[in-house]
């Protein structure tokens, strides 16, 4: 999965959940891209799960 795929997935999930504002959604996508670039998959999973409300 590419960096762009992760960003799009995060945006779709956040939007579908309806719990995240547009500003927060964009900030999360940016953070996700940064951590993906640093290749820290554990942190990405934790942050993604937290953002999705699971």
Mark where each language-model region is.
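Catalytic phosphate/metal-binding cores of nucleic-acid and nucleotide-processing enzymes, i.e., regions
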Residues: 1-54
